[in-house]
A protein has these predicted regions:
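Catalytic core of PPM/PP2C metal-dependent serine/threonine phosphatase domains
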Residues: 52-123, 144, 199-229
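Active-site beta-strand/loop microenvironment that shapes enzyme catalytic pockets
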Residues: 250-275
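Regulatory cytosolic signal-relay segments
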Residues: 1-22
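C-terminal catalytic subdomain
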Residues: 166-251, 277-278
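Acidic loop->beta-strand submotif enriched in PP2C/PPM serine/threonine phosphatases
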Residues: 19-34, 128-170
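Primarily the active-site beta-strand->alpha-helix module of PP2C/PPM metal-dependent phosphatases
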Residues: 25-80, 158, 170-186
Length: 278
């Protein structure tokens, strides 16, 4: 078995109450020939279909630029210049979190406007190996953070929209006066992993998103998106297949037809060979 980690990348999303579409977008891409995995999570301005259009444009362009290894600042400027301008706020805007990993190397995370990523090794948070912030001359009010992290089997990286960290804000609950916040999400993820060390990416993403949603169970105040990337050891799957146990099974009858056809084909082949020899 290879020592290289296997990546699980899974996301859970909830739509803001009253909206027909989630204003966040998540896209995942695996490039097998490059042993490379990419992910993009974007939160479009506002909510509903318009926000989804902004978010989808952002994730689509971001994945293409990462695939092409385009310069970070140039990529961000193209994305921001391409987004339509909101008629009310007079700004073009979509936040994003991007993930880029080559098998055997460091993982790269790029963020603008979204809550800061979480990197857990077991239940311990891991600091980045490199961390820098860049500012575009075109958009001086936007800061883009780029980090590189060393990863090991068992590590998890969590990306989310502010619908997760701000959940509970304005609900009147004392515990969520300032929302759930990143610290609350981090503590929750640690508890989940502590109780189930092999918890899958899909289950952890679902639990985080569901908890954020259920802080105000009567309504979802914002679009909620949580993406979890889990680096784990590959698992070996062995499958033994054969005819069904019960004769009454439709699959058994199918198996019988297949074996009967195979036997008939062998007889025809044998007869043809005998005729040719004669």
């Amino acid at each position: 078995m290879t020592d290289d980690p296997f990546l699980e990348m899974e996301a859970t999303q909830f739509t803001k109450t009253g909206q027909a579409a989630c204003g966040d977008d998540v896209q995942l891409l695996t490039i097998e020939k490059e042993n490379r995995s990419l992910a993009a999570l974007s939160d479009g301005l506002g909510s509903g279909v318009k926000a989804l259009v902004l978010a989808n444009m952002t994730t689509t362009m971001a994945l293409r630029f990462m695939q092409s290894n385009l310069d970070l600042l140039e990529s961000v400027e193209i994305i921001m210049d391409s987004l339509p301008v909101c008629e009310v706020r007079k700004i073009s805007y979509a936040t994003f979190s991007l993930f880029d990993y080559h098998l055997g190397g460091r993982a790269r995370i790029i963020e603008m406007g979204n809550p800061a990523y979480v990197h857990l090794r077991g239940t311990e948070e891991v600091a980045p190996a490199k961390d820098r912030t860049v500012v575009s001359a075109h958009w001086p009010d936007r800061e883009v953070r780029e980090v590189e992290v060393d990863v090991e089997p068992g590590d998890r990286i969590i990306l989310c929209s502010d619908g997760v960290t701000q959940s509970g804000l304005g609900s009147g609950q004392a515990a969520y006066k300032f929302g759930w916040r990143r610290s609350g999400m981090l503590a929750f993820a640690r508890r989940m992993i502590s109780s189930e060390p092999d918890l899958s990416a899909a289950d952890l993403a679902r639990r985080i998103a569901c908890f954020a949603k259920n802080i105000t169970p009567e309504s979802c105040k914002d679009d909620i998106s949580c993406l979890v990337i889990y680096f784990r050891h590959p698992r070996v799957l062995r499958i033994l297949t054969g005819p069904p146990y019960y004769k009454s099974s439709p699959a058994r009858r199918t198996w019988a037809r297949i074996t009967s056809s195979s036997a008939a084909a062998r007889r025809r082949t044998s007869w043809s060979a005998s005729w040719a020899a004669a």
